[in-house]
Amino acid sequence: MSRIEKMSTLGVRSFGIEDKDKQIISFFSPLTILVGPNGAGKTTIIECLKYICTGDFPPGTKGNTFVHDPKVAQETDVRAQIRLQFRDVNGEMVLVQRSMLCSQKSKKTEFKTLEGVITRIKHGEKVSLSSKCAEIDREMISCLGVSKSVLNNVIFCHQEDSNWPLSEGKALKQKFDEIFSATRYIKALDTLRQVRQTQGQKVKECQTELKYLRQNKEKACEIRDQITSKEAQLASSREIVKAYENELEPLKNRLKEIEHNLSKIMRLDNEIKALDSRKKQMEKDNSELEQKMEKVFQGTDEQLNDLYHNHQRTVREKERRLVDCQRELEKLSKEARLLNQERAELLVEQGRLQLQADRHQEHIRARDSLIQSLAAHLELDGFERGPFSERQIKNFHELVRERQEREAKTASQLLSDLTDKEALKQRQMDEMRDKKSGLGRMIELKTEILTKKQTELRNVRNELQQLEGSSDRILELDQELTKAERELSKAEKNSSIETLKAEILNLQSEKADLDRNLRKLDQEMEQLNHHTTTRTQMEMLTKDKTDKDEQIRKIKSRHSDELTSLLGYFPNKKQLEDWLHSKSKEINQTRDRLAKLNKELASAEQNKNHINNELKKKEEQLSSYEDKLFDVCGSQDFESDLDRLKEDIEKSSKQRAMLAGATAVYSQFITQLTDENQSCCPGCQRVFQTEAELQEVISDLQSKLRLAPDKLKSTESELKKKERRRDEMLGLVPMRQSIIDLKEKEIPELRNRLQSVNRDIQRLKNDIEEQETLLGTVMPEEESAKVCLTDVTIMERFQMELKDVERKIAQQAAKLQGVDLDRTVQQVNQEKQEKQHKLDTVSSKIELNRKLIQDQQEQIQHLKSKTNELKSEKLQIATNLQRRQQMEEQTVELSTEVQSLNREIKDAKEQINPLEIALEKLQQEKEELIHRKNTSNKMAQDKINDIKEKVKNIHGYMKDIENYIQDGKDDYKKQKETELNEVVIQLNECDKHKEKINKEMGTMRQDIDTKKIQERWLQDNLTLRKRREELKEVEEERKQHLKEMGQMQVLQMKNEHQKLEENIDTIKRNHSLALGRQKGYEEEILHFKKELREPQFRDAEEKYREMMIVMRTTELVNKDLDIYYKTLDHAIMKFHSMKMEEINKIIRDLWRSTYRGQDIEYIEIRSDADENVSASDKRRNYNYRVVMLKGDTALDMRGRCSAGQKVLASLIIRLALAETFCLNCGILALDEPTTNLDRENIESLAHALVEIIKSRSQQRNFQLLVITHDEDFVELLGRSEYVEKFYRVKKNIDQCSEIVKSSINSLGSYVH
């Protein structure tokens, strides 16, 4: 049997659309309860179960209001999803999912059902199937094991449809027919009856058909006899035709032979003519070729061929030599390219090596300068002048390393001393902090205890204060209790319940008499209606005619002016529809134009935005480029600045070269003047007169030599800056070009495009405004006409109905002629109204007495409750007075503890203040130590780092110098210069060789051209001799053909050919006559066979036999159908009566155990046979109604019961139907079952439901789902052993529904 286990809901009604809003509910067995206030979303759960099981939406919605509103969610699209996990009738797990989509359009919401998914779990694996809605509906009905009507009307009945058992007759009949599946069985009986009638008709048709089949069978036998006779005549005719054919065959062969010889003669004659024509053409061609040649070769053919072949061989050898020269020339060109490439690479390498040599000298000078600077800074002796040797440099590094170690050691010692002092201060601070923290924790603990004790003390004092007035309250309670008991006794004594009950019995008897009188009047009214129906119909038709005339007049007066202004006249429906169609077409065309213009405007706006963005980018790019250019140049005159900078670099380069050369010259001059004892100036050869003059020159040269390196360094530094600036400016050349392009081309073009687009946009806006104005004029006219169309359609319908009414009035008037009745329907109806008024009065008195009984019972119950409450309060006060002394002692004890705690907290706070002052002082001393440590450490580190940086720079220069020497760059430079000279020599030799080959190739091309002319003359001679040979062959072939024709006897062949044709014609005529007779026989035979193949004669005997079998078989089948129809009809009646008896028994038991009123003993469903069914119609229909019984009286419950009785009756009928029809599905959902029920009936309903659960608790798949807002009703159900948990349905802060599982014990403590 099937049962539901779990369901998740997302995006349905008030359930949220986010994943976090998804609500999952697990269904308990046997009872699941959902509690919540109105609007929380309880009924939505029933709607979800119904939708996922049947695919039907709740009443009054087609789906769009079933999904969470997109406007509320502030979303365009809202997806809803419901998933259900359940067990099918076989106990297998099934998961089903249905999804929906609701989209918010401009004026309405659009709903769409998405594809559903059914998933089964077989052998631990999921098997999913995507299905359409109809397929899922069928699958769900199959899985749950109940019909769709039972699911909709019994198991998951919606709250709005819950009272359907008391609906009007037609709707009630339809519901019960669907539940009983009566329609299907009635259709089955109809089908059986129709089949039986069809089979009977078929028997008659078979008998008629057999008559004609017997005639066809006899006719077929006659045709077969005629075919046998004609086939014998045909055989004789065929032998005659064959004799003629044998005689004709040798004549045809001889004729064929003669025709072959004649065709051969014709062919030879044609060939001779063709050879004559070919001979003339060949002679003409030879003559033309001889005229074209200057002279004809006179030697033999062998001499001509040898001369031609030798000539060709000479030409081929020269061409091969020409190709070889061409290859050699290409090879030399390739070799020259490689040599040029190698020369370029060597030139680049030579320049690079020269630059490295210059840089090497610069590194040596920079190293010596740094050593002198650092030695002076560290006060090291022996390093005042350079250059320095390797030993001096090594000694310098050793001295610097020792100095670094001394500085590092001193700094480390100072840092260590300051760190020790800092750690000492930190330890002192930690000790004080620990002491302070301990006091703080103690204060917190004592304060917390103090707060608790103070709260406890206040509570005890409040209770004592309340108890002070308890003595007086006991006296008041005694007085109130005495008064309440007196009132209770008085109320019980004055109660008239028994009298009222007796009066109710009398009134019920009177009511029964009035009911009988009313039924008699109904019978009389029915008899009168036989004659008065016509009169009533006449009156109704006359009134209907007046009403329709008035309606037509109103419609015309309401729309006459408006339609006349639109069309110029008052139209009929067809004219107005045509006008609307043309107007709608005009509106659609206008809308299309407007949409197209809007699309063009959007495109233009987008283009404008794109152009604006592009213009803004270009302007920003121009500004950025100009700023960069100004930052580098200092002005906007880029070209002039660049030219001036190049001139400055050239000047600085010359100055650097001069300073570099001056250093070498000054050194050489000083050496010459000192080492060689030269007495004259090395530059001007002037002789020095004295030693002092010589020393003065040397001193001057040394001074210039000392200043030269600094000047050289300064010049090089300035040159590098200028070169860097030049490189930066050269790098900005493309940017300068971009600035020019932006200013002169790109930005002006964009501005022009922007102006053009703005003009287009303005034009489009004007067009759109014009179309919108037109649309605003036409659309109100169309809307106005549409409103009028509805009324015009109604008016035309009224006019047609008016004609029909007038015709019916005439018919009824003819029927009323001569009719005269004494007692009218109005008189009977008036008497019936009087009786009905009395009946209503009696019913009102019964209800009034019942209300009085209920009011008196409620008053007595209220007084009893009040008495019990006063007794309970008095007992509680007496108990509290006994605890008074204990609370006073507790007050004294608590006051003492509070005072003690206050003292302890005060002492602790006084100890904390001195600790905070000392701690602050230590913190200040510690920060001073840290500052001293950081300052001294920074100074020492800066000094050490400065030395390290300078040593690092010296090492860098030394490494570059060593690398240059170790790499052998000087030798490598000389080697590359030698290689360059060799490449230049090879390149010159290659050019000379190429020139020589070019001359040789020119000579050979001239020789080849001369040889080609001679070759053409030899070739023409060969062609001429070949054609002369072919001409001789043609003449020989012509002579041979003439000789062959002369040997044939042409005249004799033609005479014989003519005689043979005459003989053959005679035989053919005789043959044709014989063949004609043969074809006549064949056609007759074919005609008979064709006639025999016609439908009525083909297989006539077999058809006759088969039809006989069909007729006998159909007769037997018809008898069986008659038996089966009667059996099924009897079974349907039996099933219906058994089910109705079973349902009514359950309804009686449930009503008696639930309903606490005395006016209705029980209720039941009556199924009466349809009295309107004619005797000829064998279909049996049932009309259903719910009746209430008191004694022997049964009344229709519809229209007579109260709202509470209606709810209870509908609920009990659904319970009975579920008990009867849900054998495979033990699920039942009750939505607000306590609606309109009083407290007594609510309690009895709860007791009845518990009994139902108890009786079906052994059925493991029984599931009752109860939805209610009445927590008292839930508490009554919770007193049973079947409820431990229930669900609360509520709205969260986002006003989305939430489902929360709660314990049944939490009912009393829950606050809405």
From Swiss-Prot:
Chief place where the protein resides: nucleus
Report the top EC class in one word: hydrolase
- Residue ranges annotated as coiled coil are 200-534, 635-673, 706-734, 754-954, 1019-1075
* Tissue spec. comment: Present at low levels in the heart at fetal-day 17, at relatively constant levels at postnatal days 10, 17 and 21 and at slightly lower levels in the adult heart. Detected in liver, kidney and lung. Barely detectable in skeletal muscle with slightly higher levels observed in brain and the ventricles of the heart (at protein level).
What does the entry report about post-translational modification of this chain?
Answer: Phosphorylation at Ser-635 by ATM in response to DNA damage is required for double-strand break (DSB) repair.
**Highest taxon of source:** Eukaryota
Assigned EC number: 3.6.-.-
Q: Where does Mg(2+) bind?
A: 43, 159
Reaction(s) catalysed (UniProt annotation): ATP + H2O = ADP + phosphate + H(+)
Job description of the protein: Component of the MRN complex, which plays a central role in double-strand break (DSB) repair, DNA recombination, maintenance of telomere integrity and meiosis. The MRN complex is involved in the repair of DNA double-strand breaks (DSBs) via homologous recombination (HR), an error-free mechanism which primarily occurs during S and G2 phases. The complex (1) mediates the end resection of damaged DNA, which generates proper single-stranded DNA, a key initial steps in HR, and is (2) required for the recruitment of other repair factors and efficient activation of ATM and ATR upon DNA damage.
The entry's family comment says: Belongs to the SMC family. RAD50 subfamily.
User: Could you give the domain comment from the record?
Assistant: The zinc-hook, which separates the large intramolecular coiled coil regions, contains 2 Cys residues that coordinate one molecule of zinc with the help of the 2 Cys residues of the zinc-hook of another RAD50 molecule, thereby forming a V-shaped homodimer. The two heads of the homodimer, which constitute the ATP-binding domain, interact with the MRE11 homodimer.
Task: Provide the protein name.
Answer: DNA repair protein RAD50
Protein source organism? Rattus norvegicus (Rat)
Q: What is the lineage of its organism?
A: Eukaryota, Metazoa, Chordata, Craniata, Vertebrata
